[in-house]
């Protein structure tokens, strides 16, 4: 079983790359800073529910999808 932070970080990166977004572009769309997205993907930051929603909206997905294990997340 994957821990929640690892699952979230893996899925953010997967969906970001699937959309062909850079960390900077995702950050702009979500109204966040690029270093924050980078830290999330490296599991160095915790995240608020508000920012989960902002990232999901920027990626065009539902927030719950960022916590689903076993998606095609091998990037």
PLM feature segments, named:
Residues 10-25, 29:
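Short basic helix-loop element that most often maps to the first helix and adjoining turn
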Residues 24, 35, 53:
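Residues within helix-turn-helix
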Residues 52-56, 66-67:
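Hydrophobic micro-packing sites on short alpha-helices
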Residues 65-75:
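Short, charged recognition helix plus adjacent turn
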């Amino acid at each position: 079983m994957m821990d929640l932070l690892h699952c979230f970080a893996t899925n953010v990166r997967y969906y970001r790359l699937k959309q062909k977004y850079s960390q900077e572009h995702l950050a702009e769309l979500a109204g966040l800073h690029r270093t924050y997205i980078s830290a999330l993907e490296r599991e160095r930051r915790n995240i608020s529910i508000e920012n989960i929603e902002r990232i999901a909206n920027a990626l065009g997905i539902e927030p719950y999808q960022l916590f689903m294990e076993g998606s095609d997340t091998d990037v």
